Swiss-Prot record:
The FYVE domain is important for binding to the endosomal membrane. May play a role in early endosome fusion upstream of RAB5, hence regulating receptor trafficking and fluid-phase transport. Enhances cellular sensitivity to TNF-induced apoptosis. Residues 237-247 have a biased composition (Acidic residues). It is found in: Early endosome membrane; Endoplasmic reticulum. The keyword NADP does not apply. This is Pleckstrin homology domain-containing family F member 2. Residues 222-236 have a biased composition (Polar residues). Zn(2+) 2 binds at C175, C178, C204, C207. Zn(2+) 1 binds at C158, C161, C183, C186. A zinc finger (FYVE-type) spans 152-212. The keyword Membrane applies.
């Protein structure tokens, strides 16, 4: 079905509408063989709080952006090659329901759908697209993924030393390797993580020692408590993942 739609006029028009919604600041999306599979609003668990984002699933990429005017204008376009994507379900917890992790070597994050059916459909379509791409290319699934960042609201004290309380002066930082929220003294070191950046990035003391010695880092569970997260319907925001990329 995807091959049949690839060169159809209807598919070209749908992709053209998406390009127009992102405007000149967005990347061109129409290329031979690309098909728009589906779209919808998902709630992305960002560093500061959950935020509504518009997602577009193509047969080879996943695109998302900030909602400026619903179905008319989006900005801060992000494009994720599906070949590098792995997804895992997230258990329901409080108001955070119907979620899953989108994991890539560069960046990983959690998203939440409005219903269990919507979640199932998204995960099924993403898995099918990834599977088809890997089969065509003969490549193997990506082995290593960037850590999912623990939201700021989940840590009132440093997750490494368990002592430093966060204040306007004692700022929160994120380790790029484990995703923990850590204090300045516990994250003074930097280490080169080629999949994330061409320059050394901030890592916590624990991860720095493990990386420096070549030791295997223990896997981190992403089912941490998220109590108190603001998960209302008023999270449409014109700021975005700048707060995910800052320290």
């Amino acid at each position: 079905m995807v091959d049949r739609l690839a060169n159809s006029e209807a598919n070209s028009k749908r992709i053209g509408v998406v390009e127009a919604c992102f405007g000149t600041a967005g990347q061109p999306l129409a290329i031979p063989g690309r098909v728009l599979i589906g779209e919808g609003v998902l709630t992305k668990l960002c560093r500061k709080r959950p935020k509504a984002r518009q997602f577009f699933l193509f047969n080879d990429i996943l695109v998302y952006g900030n909602i400026v005017i619903q179905k008319k204008k989006y900005n801060k376009q992000h494009i994720i090659p599906l070949e590098s994507v792995t997804i895992d379900t997230v258990e329901d917890e409080g108001e955070l329901r119907n979620g899953w992790l989108i994991k890539t070597p560069t960046k990983s994050f959690a998203v939440y759908a409005a219903t269990a059916t919507e979640k199932s459909e998204w995960m099924s379509h993403i898995n099918k697209c990834v599977s088809d791409l890997l089969e065509k290319s003969g490549k193997s699934p990506t082995g290593e993924h960037a850590a999912v960042w623990v939201p700021d609201s989940e840590a009132t004290v440093c997750m490494r030393c368990q002592k430093m309380k966060f204040t306007p002066v004692n700022r929160r930082h994120h380790c790029r390797k484990c995703g923990f929220v850590v204090c300045g003294p516990c994250s003074e070191k930097k280490f080169l993580l080629p999949s994330q950046s061409s320059k050394p990035v901030r890592v916590c003391e624990f991860c720095y020692k493990q990386l420096s010695t070549g030791a295997t880092l223990p896997p981190r569970s992403d089912s941490y408590s998220r109590q108190g997260s603001d998960f209302g319907s008023n999270n449409i925001s014109d700021d975005d993942d700048d707060d995910d990329s800052s320290d």
